[in-house]
């Protein structure tokens, strides 16, 4: 762990440009990295916060084929969507680059060539899966099969998303091509491998011995499991038609494996930024006084803690990450987030339904971040976080301070009189919070840090509630000047301390308090007058509006519709029954009828007792449809009735027929009935 670094290089996992960004990405990677970077800048630190679009690999080619466009068109489309989402949610990258950029192609090629020239790769001809029908080798997501470790039948050729294991395509049991559905054959091909086994001792000493106390247990444990299991050579090239060409002779048709080229994207993004800003990029990657931190999700731990460090060690001139604070996964309403199944809250769609409420989502995701275990996002919790915390605690305090200052002093910060013991204690407690919040942030405990920020707002609310300036203004207006001065110091401190977490709120507070000077993090502790007497503040505005039940129900309904659609898509039709003769069918007397009465069967949850006009009579039919319909809503409904079914007693009532039904995707029943009006009761169906 580096003590007192001169600069910080912060990286956030490169998002893959085959789809938009959802709340899982934001909670797992981009919120914590943004909070950390913003906090460091408020400390006056030299920060390079780097990210960019990951634009190579099999998933891009697959998306292009699915959408009927070129890979370049795919990455251009989603790079634009992703960039906008990051801007919309205030993710403060110093540079957001692209791995399709020339500077990245050059950087990745040079990196590979240096290791190649040093003899760090193993060149080997191996047997790989090959789709003869598509005339293509099957790497990564071009092949699915059964995971040899957990039995998941939908594991990919590079990773099992169920158990998180990193795989080779040849590890899969019963592999199938995702291009044609064919069973692949084995075919020889030449590739280059990074011999990870050579770096086992280095990784053991560096991580298992050197970072046991400061790396998160979930990260340390996964890395230890990998090392203890024995590291093996890892391919760094692929047989693909999209990506960075392998820059050596005899490598025609080969591309750099996306997980070799992608982390180098952090370096090329830094080069691009440094050239633009007139800085020396090497200081941020090759200087021992620089602290390098990778923010990722748990599915990327092996790449950032084993493969990329081995690459950096092999190259020889780069620093190693000081920490890799990977998060676990965020689930949605009890189910795993899934882009393919549209089980997600997409950032661009969120803003359509909750305009200008970016900080509410930032808050809810940070408060419930999956820092040490998988966590669940629910819309009810989102609503409660806004209404009961942001609005009721934070927003309420700011509103009272601004309203009372404008009411009593026409918006001018009053000159305080002598501080009471309560005032002194409150201001002393306030000055302690920056260090408390810093301690949490610097240990990557962002949930804990956010909780301490809210305690500052609670401190302000308690101070006002105990002091009651709205009552005292009638009896001791001079005392109220001091009370409001203290409250305004807390409000200004909140403006500074909330910026890493709630940047849009911080900007609103700038306008409300008319703060022009750039206050630093440590000013809250060292500066006794964060906002000066005589300073005129602005008018108040509602920071956090109440989120109503109807808004939340709309989101829940949207997810239910998605769930229903997924059930329908995945549901397989029942196999055809045995053949019957026409005479068997002709025996059934099917007629149109109308339900004229309906009531629930006593002591039965599923049964309704119906009176049905069949055109030939009015008869009683007991039907198991009570879980799909209420009696009131089906009176007058036309239905299809099997009228010559032998009567059958159900709970003591004789049922004299059967009504034809079918199933909807959500499991409810639906009537099979005429699709036009005017069909009379008793009309036959044949």
UniProtKB/Swiss-Prot annotation:
Its EC number is 6.1.1.10. One of its GO terms (biological process) is methionyl-tRNA aminoacylation. GO terms for molecular function: ATP binding; metal ion binding; methionine-tRNA ligase activity; tRNA binding. A motif ('KMSKS' region) lies at residues 336-340. It is found in: Cytoplasm. Its main location: cytoplasm. GO terms for cellular component: cytosol. The keyword Ligase applies. Its cofactor is Zn(2+). It catalyses: tRNA(Met) + L-methionine + ATP = L-methionyl-tRNA(Met) + AMP + diphosphate. Residues 584-686 form the tRNA-binding domain. Keywords: Aminoacyl-tRNA synthetase, ATP-binding, Cytoplasm, Ligase, Metal-binding, Nucleotide-binding, Protein biosynthesis, RNA-binding, tRNA-binding, Zinc. Binds 1 zinc ion per subunit. The keyword Iron does not apply. Is required not only for elongation of protein synthesis but also for the initiation of all mRNA translation through initiator tRNA(fMet) aminoacylation. Belongs to the class-I aminoacyl-tRNA synthetase family. MetG type 1 subfamily. Homodimer. This is Methionine--tRNA ligase. It comes from Flavobacterium psychrophilum (strain ATCC 49511 / DSM 21280 / CIP 103535 / JIP02/86).
